[in-house]
Amino acid sequence: MGNSYAGQLKSARFEEALHNSIEASLRCSSVVPRPIFSQLYLDPDQHPFSSADVKPKVEDLDKDLVNRYTQNGSLDFSNNLTVNEMEDDEDDEEMSDSNSPPIPYSQKPAPEGSCTTDGFCQAGKDLRLVSLCMEQIDIPAGFLLVGAKSPNLPEHILVCAVDKRFLPDDHGKNALLGFSGNCIGCGERGFRYFTEFSNHINLKLTTQPKKQKHLKYYLVRSSQGVLSKGPLICWKECRSRQSSASCHSIKPSSSVSSTVTPENGTTNGYKSGFTQTDAANGNSSHGGKGSASSSTPAHTGNYSLSPRPSYASGDQATMFISGPPKKRHRGWYPGSPLPQPGLVVPVPTVRPLSRTEPLLSAPVPQTPLTGILQPRPIPAGETVIVPENLLSNSGVRPVILIGYGTLPYFYGNVGDIVVSPLLVNCYKIPQLENKDLEKLGLTGSQFLSVENMILLTIQYLVRLGPDQVPLREEFEQIMLKAMQEFTLRERALQIGAQCVPVSPGQLPWLARLIASVSQDLVHVVVTQNSLAEGISETLRTLSEMRHYQRLPDYVVVICASKIRGNEFCVVVLGQHQSRALAESMLTTSEFLKEISYELITGKVSFLASHFKTTSLGDDLDKLLEKMQQRRGDSVVTPFDGDLNECVSPQEAAAMIPTQNLDLDNETFHIYQPQLTVARKLLSQVCAIADSGSQSLDLGHFSKVDFIIIVPRSEVLVQQTLQRIRQSGVLVDLGLEENGTAHQRAEKYVVRLDNEIQTKFEVFMRRVKQNPYTLFVLVHDNSHVELTSVISGSLSHSEPSHGLADRVINCREVLEAFNLLVLQVSSFPYTLQTQQSRISSSNEVHWIQLDTGEDVGCEEKLYFGLSEYSKSLQWGITSPLLRCDETFEKMVNTLLERYPRLHSMVVRCYLLIQQYSEALMALTTMASLRDHSTPETLSIMDDLISSPGKNKSGRGHMLIIRVPSVQLAMLAKERLQEVRDKLGLQYRFEIILGNPATELSVATHFVARLKSWRGNEPEEWIPRTYQDLDGLPCIVILTGKDPLGETFPRSLKYCDLRLIDSSYLTRTALEQEVGLACCYVSKEVIRGPTVALDLSGKEQERAAVSENDSDELLIDLERPQSNSSAVTGTSGSIMENGVSSSSTADKSQKQSLTPSFQSPATSLGLDEGVSASSAGAGAGETLKQECDSLGPQMASSTTSKPSSSSSGPRTLPWPGQPIRGCRGPQAALPPVVILSKAAYSLLGSQKSGKLPSSSSLLPHADVAWVSSLRPLLNKDMSSEEQSLYYRQWTLARQHHADYSNQLDPASGTRNFHPRRLLLTGPPQVGKTGSYLQFLRILFRMLIRLLEVDVYDEEEINTDHNESSEVSQSEGEPWPDIESFSKMPFDVSVHDPKYSLMSLVYTEKLAGVKQEVIKESKVEEPRKRETVSIMLTKYAAYNTFHHCEQCRQYMDFTSASQMSDSTLHAFTFSSSMLGEEVQLYFIIPKSKESHFVFSKQGKHLESMRLPLVSDKNLNAVKSPIFTPSSGRHEHGLLNLFHAMEGISHLHLLVVKEYEMPLYRKYWPNHIMLVLPGMFNNAGVGAARFLIKELSYHNLELERNRLEELGIKRQCVWPFIVMMDDSCVLWNIHSVQEPSSQPMEVGVSSKNVSLKTVLQHIEATPKIVHYAILGIQKWSSKLTSQSLKAPFSRCHVHDFILLNTDLTQNVQYDFNRYFCEDADFNLRTNSSGLLICRFNNFSLMKKHVQVGGQRDFIIKPKIMVSESLAPILPLQYICAPDSEHTLLAAPAQFLLEKFLQHASYKLFPKAIHNFRSPVLAIDCYLNIGPEVAICYISSRPHSSNVNCEGVFFSGLLLYLCDSFVGADLKKFKFLKGATLCVICQDRSSLRQTIVRLELEDEWQFRLRDEFQTANSSDDKPLYFLTGRHV
């Protein structure tokens, strides 16, 4: 036995140590005692290889040792060694094959002639790291270099190449079993066994070769390329030896790495049974020969316990595997799942450890197996022989729940037992992070002992009672609570030692004590030797039992072994429980296969023959025949008559019902919640676009296209098509023409079937071909069939397997930048695992529906799962959620009789019989009434009697849910046969709802539906369930899952009695009840007792409260009993359509009162009610809704659309909730009949919003991460639930998300950036919501293609004035002779001046003062804007990208940044009185526009063209655009506006903003203003542009003069243009046609190039100073275009002649009105300003940057929350203690003047005859005042002010031209003066120089300064009064 007997070991000493160890571990509760083996073998004084070993007796060995060996025979080393000891002492010794002392591990001798030197391979090549560290080693992809340690060369590491799949990941997990490696030395490849490989590289081992032991390190290359020893290979999950379970204490078989996988994830989580070696069995068959085969003991591999190995997991396991397996890979699957009789069936076992450790949690990767080995002899104590005919004799197939410890082998009739791992993971304590443990209220050290776990299990089983089945999730919570209690108790005691654990001796009687209260339902069997004894005993008793004897439901088998400690398992014998547990282990697909197998093989024949007779014992078929003969040819009247009235079939077919005009099928509304959710989706898309990840660029797209992928359901396809057609979305998105949209809709909906591949390829081709279209792939019901492609190809599963994965997760979809994926699901849990591909921030959840305030305004409320649960507390006599107890009793009786059939088969047969007999009972055989359950009887009664009550013939729908297609077809045939024989075939229809086929409805029923609908075409047939509204029918709904089909309002009953214990996941259960979810009348929820249960007595008491109609009266949380005061809704009870007479109709009815004949279940927000395209009204509202996204959606940077928009509020809720047969009725929720198992989970809602089903496993394709986890809180919102599932669930191996594992490099998961998830309860209206989303997404893209431009009429216009100089209309250019004779119009017409001071003209003096609108100083008003589509000639901001202007924008790479050069340019300015240094940043590509010095370093000038140049592909004038604060939003991309031709464009930016502008506009020339202008206004920029341009003109003239060109030939113009100019138009006046009408104006969009080239071609252009164009307005009239040219102010976009205006300067101090000021100055200098009226400019409303006001703050902030500072605080008395402000002095002054006219110029207010006289300046001093501008320059032209008395005088920074001749102006008495100067001394000098004190009176207190500190150079001004 290897060297395990080393040391002087007497067996007595061994026993003593063993007992001491056990005793110590039992006594101790805190400190880990030193286990037995470390005491015996690791004593330092003992030499490990002493030769004087003593043979122990085989018996002792058997008794004591065997059970201490773990699976590989390795010794159970303690877990308190240090890491290093563990590294070396982890020798996994094997028991040798004889009883002799150990011999070294014998290995095959090396082949002849091969090298055996240590450190070299058998081919003689060196493998040592020292010699290979500099070599370039070539290794195949997927391999890693690792270092192996040879025991003979401790100082060396040998280099090997190993396939990394066989190595563990960073957490010590996921290494494949086995080995695959290559020799680096000789290059030999393909070693498949580590043993073979270790021989080849000469490891010369003394022990069994193990990769875990000998492959020690990863090898890494350093930065110098040297190969060196890297990190240790992490074979164990955890190295911390204190708290967690010992990882190496259970060894997997020889080359299985002990990977710990996530609990019940991909592995089975149990170890295979322990087989001893032959030697240990005393069967030394090999006689100690030193061959390799004899020395390797027979390992049992790891057994797959699952009938579908590809899904093998800890949650499902059955006993279907036989024979110990060979070692295989995880990816290989077993051949035959059926057991071979008589072979051993290994059963997983969990080995106990020494008692000191917490429970073991080391599941091993399963290796399913193919070959069947010969069974090895096994000690009798470890086997159980399953008795023959166990199932037949006892009628029970026992289920053995694996507990804790080693399960024995089972022989014999193993098909009759099932081994279930249901609770096994509850007994393993998972490895949890400390922080997670703290959250759970646990400490790492305190876990439960086995004894406690046994007692808890028994307690749980006792508590379950006879009806319930153990639920894993329930038990996990019990275990968690118990641990939390222990932790609390331990903390309370502070010292763990005082906590007395249950001793093994006490365990049996404590266990029996607990079980004694169970009324014999739980038995405890205690054995001494092994569990096998107890199990055998139990099975034997079972097989010998007589049927009448009562069995316990559970037998708990405890093995109280002294050696192994306690082990236990539970044998479930209860008829109901064992069946439920066995069936719940199969997945839905598996049990459906099982059912079809039972039907095909005829196993059901006994059952079928049982149901051939009625409950009274008559032969059913004969009885029906008899009834048919008695009736003869006639049939029961189809409607409007009793069941006894008969007519001929011809008459029946010809009966036409009255038309029902109330149908609201076609009118489509979209409701407020749907709008809100659509907006949430849109805002999430904007958030993705804004998130810097560059995964979505919304500015790129101009169109939206979509495809909707739905599961394989024909009805769902048709339903979705109907929604698309009714919503009009195809026309709205511009995808189809109005006429053809109906037919074309089909290409937008695709089913997940085998044809999807081709259709999807067509779609993806469209995606690739249309890069400017944003495609949306909607994956509806995305939780269905979300299996991975890989698992689908390996297992023979459904054809649809993996299709969704193939489509949604294919590479093209992930990479397409113009494709958004929207997954829509009511049960999204399977998409919310740790491996989810959707970021949790991209989930959009339906808005919480149960908020009180919504209820007031909406007719319909959603009635979903939690409302159903809560309705049980309403206390009404006929609840909405029911369990048919009578039916359940019948089922149980039958199940006992047919133990071999699946319970669903039995239930289905019974259900068919129930409905058949109910039909017969109600028509012909009243004697059968007592044999139908009252539930079934009342449903059928309602179904067949309701059409008879009136002429419309409308009735109810009943859904019977039968998941198995074969059973459903059987049910349809049987029921149809019974119906037809009873003559009811015209009364109600029976429809098979098979997802794979279309609906088929008998022609006479189609005719009836058509006549109700009225206007349907001849060939119309019902295609969706909603089309069946009002048709009395039974729909037998089949298929694995319900797929989201919407049912009509006439659905009244939903029979889910077949949905049983096989549906134990949250999704499976909830989606079944989801069938019945719908919108109901408000009354139902507000006063359920009134609406649903009005017996006569309560009608009288129902108080009608007038004032309560707006609030939610019945809180859903509060139970309300029948007798509590019932509050009705406003209005009388008759409104609900309930009258006492109708209640009396059928007194014996047990279901809802019959007055609700057709509850409108799914009116209102049906799944996907969508916006009405019918009627202009709705269309209008929609447009409004989209427009109301508001201007802020124009850029993609605003991610939240405004929700307070006016649009949607006006959308109509339907006025009448339901259109029934008699007036308006309440829409009611359908009644749902459940099986007992489902009822207990859905009906038992204790508190909170969610029913108990929410704590189940969320979906069969996911697994819990750990059995220790917090409970899903019942009040969690869906967002919180999502986060919970993302933390606590994992995708299983066959799940499509399984492959999305952690990225090892970054430690994060890959979320797909363009994928969203929309979740909302079933039937809440998600389809309508996402169709609306598509619509508003398109609107928003259009908004991005639209621009808001100012649309304001000119101000101060007087169209009556006729130009004195007549201009001939239609002239392209002005004639300078006649133009210069026109007077200049000094009035400012630009609408942005509407709140500024008027400029005085003689005409203004004649205006009556009352006419002028008084506009008090107000907040900056909202200027009028209008939305215009951008055209191909627009100027763009940075959000525009297209292929054509990519070169122009040049974003290619960061390296481009360095391609531009910085040049200083200095010139002197007389105005500034100093040198100015500007910087040019010139990209390489633009250098041709400049002249550099010979050395090429120094910038000399900017090239200018000649006046005579005629180049059609260029504009001559350089374009300057000053811009500030708009690096992203400024319209600086002129590529399209210039039609791509050559032009020179310079951005003028402030120094501090330069880096930003440079980043966004790397290919633009920048002109950077000096730092001193960082706070300056736009006046400074314009001043410097003009100064620079004049200086440059002189330089160019000098340069070109040397080339012989005359100075006056150089082009003197520049364009100065704002950064918000977006579009240019040309206008022409259309000739009026013959009939007298308004002359029209036609306008056309033109490019900036066209405008500039036209203006530059003006004859004698050099004689004009400024040329401009007018501002666009939608109200441009032919009147304003009468004169093609005006001599007036021009703004925003001007051609400036720098030569003529050399001496007219912009005021560089100015922030406001600098252009009007400059125009007035230019005009007074006698220069010509010309405006071209046939061109107009559109200016974009840009919300950021530009002339936006500074926020004026105090210089020293005292507190954060200061009141806003008022304009009058912008000035103060000099040297006062006033709050000083942090703003430029000039800015404060201009802002002050705008608001101070009342203070400064009281006489001027509204007195336009007496304006304020302003010398050399135009300043805005408020709109109430007119300013008369007078220039002081000699020879200047000024307005005539003869006889004008001025009301004030404004002197602003006046220069030496202003002299004492001011005295010639006349002033009113009391006129006021304001003199503004740079500082106090110049203020005094000015007053003296101008002799102002002669006429004006000053007071000391009239001196002011702007509220700046002295460092900020305040401005000073003095006021005075005229005397």
Curated annotation (Swiss-Prot):
The chain crosses the membrane at residues 1843-1862. Belongs to the GREB1 family. This is GREB1-like protein. It is found in: Membrane. Changing L1567P: In RHDA3; probable loss of function; does not rescue renal hypoplasia in zebrafish morphants. The keyword Membrane applies. It holds the Pfam family TAGT. One of its GO terms (biological process) is retinoic acid receptor signaling pathway. It is linked to Renal hypodysplasia/aplasia 3: A severe, autosomal dominant disease encompassing a spectrum of kidney development defects. Clinical manifestations are highly variable and include bilateral or unilateral renal agenesis, renal aplasia, hypoplasia, (cystic) dysplasia, severe obstructive uropathy, and vesicoureteral reflux. Bilateral renal agenesis is almost invariably fatal in utero or in the perinatal period. Unilateral renal agenesis can lead to future health issues including end-stage renal disease. Deafness, autosomal dominant, 80: A form of non-syndromic, sensorineural hearing loss. Sensorineural hearing loss results from damage to the neural receptors of the inner ear, the nerve pathways to the brain, or the area of the brain that receives sound information. DFNA80 is characterized by severe inner ear malformations, bilateral cochlear aplasia and absent eighth cranial nerve. Residues 87-111, 246-326, 1101-1222 are annotated as: Disordered. Its main location: membrane. It is a single-pass membrane protein. Residues 263-278, 296-307, 1119-1161 have a biased composition (Polar residues). Changing I1655T: In RHDA3; probable loss of function; does not rescue renal hypoplasia in zebrafish morphants. Widely expressed, with prominent expression in the cochlea. Expressed at high levels in fetal kidney. In adult tissues, highest levels in vagina, cervix and epididymis. Plays a major role in early metanephros and genital development. Changing V1690M: In RHDA3; probable loss of function; does not rescue renal hypoplasia in zebrafish morphants. GO terms for cellular component: membrane. Keywords: Deafness, Developmental protein, Disease variant, Membrane, Non-syndromic deafness, Transmembrane, Transmembrane helix. Residues 252-262, 1195-1206 have a biased composition (Low complexity). Changing N283S: In DFNA80; uncertain significance. Coiled coil: none annotated. It comes from the Eukaryota. InterPro entries: GREB1 (IPR028422), GREB1-like_2nd (IPR048659), GREB1-like_C (IPR046927), GREB1-like_cpSF2 (IPR048657), GREB1_N (IPR046926), TAGT (IPR049100). It comes from Homo sapiens. Changing R1066P: In RHDA3; probable loss of function; does not rescue renal hypoplasia in zebrafish morphants.
